[in-house]
């Protein structure tokens, strides 16, 4: 059975206290950015230290969060090297990786079978084939790809830009997001499990949740006072807004 896609993923943490605050709010997944050009970049050694420190914390509302490493154009071997020093629950591919990247990774003799979340843009029909090819991996029982993350397109920066997706393109959900879910979910036609990202804030998350109805949401800049520094009040307002919509 594949890992369940989180309903809430907060990304780009650089401080243990911020992660603890997010987990106390019940956030289901924490993103750690291993892209050296990102303002939220942390070295794998620092990430391991943070995870070790968090493991000592007790009494958190969310007992089993997913810790997801964000990688941009790493080779499978480079990702494997990070995984050896920094245990992660899943990895997020946020660069130009093709579906062949997954095949190459899964062919490595020491590949741990870590679940893969694929971040992709959606700008309309020009991205239909890309969504379909990765959606097919999500639908496959034998693939480690367990979901998609739909983010804003930026030819230079990879995530965390605050740019908004053209979310209106996802209402109604395009056919490329649908697949035969018989093998995985026991249903004839289902939508690809995906997280909505790109410019979400406490002020707009409820609106776009109601319109797009994704599996979950991902946010970085919308809960920060500056890149990598989370604002606890913004995190709380974001979670409150999400929950008010999710319970409707």
Where are these regions (language model features)?
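N-terminal amphipathic alpha-helix/helix-capping segment at the start of soluble metabolic enzymes
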Residues: 1-10, 182
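Glycine-rich phosphate-binding active-site loops on the catalytic face of alpha/beta enzymes
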Residues: 27-39, 92-98, 153-157, 212-235
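N-terminal basic/disordered segments at the start of proteins
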Residues: 8-18
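Well-formed, non-transmembrane alpha-helical positions, independent of function
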Residues: 21-24, 81-85, 104, 207-211, ...
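Conserved anion-binding
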Residues: 34-39, 51-196, 204
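Alpha-helix N-cap and loop-to-helix initiation/capping positions
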Residues: 14, 38-49, 161-165, 169, ...
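Glycine-rich adenosine-cofactor-binding loop
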Residues: 10-12, 196-201
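C-terminal helical cap(s) of enzyme catalytic domains, especially alpha/beta-barrels
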Residues: 44-54, 103-107, 220-248
């Amino acid at each position: 059975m594949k890992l369940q896609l989180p309903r809430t993923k907060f990304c780009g943490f650089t401080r243990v206290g911020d992660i603890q605050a997010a987990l106390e709010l019940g956030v289901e997944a924490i993103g750690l950015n291993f892209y050296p050009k990102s303002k939220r970049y942390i070295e794998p050694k620092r990430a391991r230290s943070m995870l070790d420190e968090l493991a000592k914390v007790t009494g958190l509302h969310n007992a089993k969060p997913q810790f997801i490493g964000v990688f941009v154009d790493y080779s499978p071997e480079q990702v494997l090297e990070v995984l050896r020093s920094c245990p992660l629950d899943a990895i997020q591919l946020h660069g130009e990786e093709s579906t062949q990247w997954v095949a190459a990774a899964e062919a490595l003799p020491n590949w741990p079978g870590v679940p893969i979340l694929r971040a992709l843009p959606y700008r309309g029909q020009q991205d239909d084939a890309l969504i379909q090819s990765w959606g097919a991996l999500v639908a496959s029982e034998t693939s480690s790809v367990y979901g998609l993350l739909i983010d804003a397109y930026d030819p230079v920066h990879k995530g965390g830009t605050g740019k908004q997706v053209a979310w209106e393109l996802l209402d109604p959900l395009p056919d490329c997001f649908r697949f035969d879910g018989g093998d995985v979910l026991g249903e004839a036609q289902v939508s690809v499990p995906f997280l909505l990202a790109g410019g979400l804030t406490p002020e707009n998350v409820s609106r776009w949740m109601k319109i797009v109805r994704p599996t979950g949401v991902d946010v970085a800049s919308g809960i920060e006072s500056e890149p990598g520094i989370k604002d606890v009040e913004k995190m709380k307002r974001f979670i409150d807004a999400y929950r008010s919509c999710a319970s409707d």
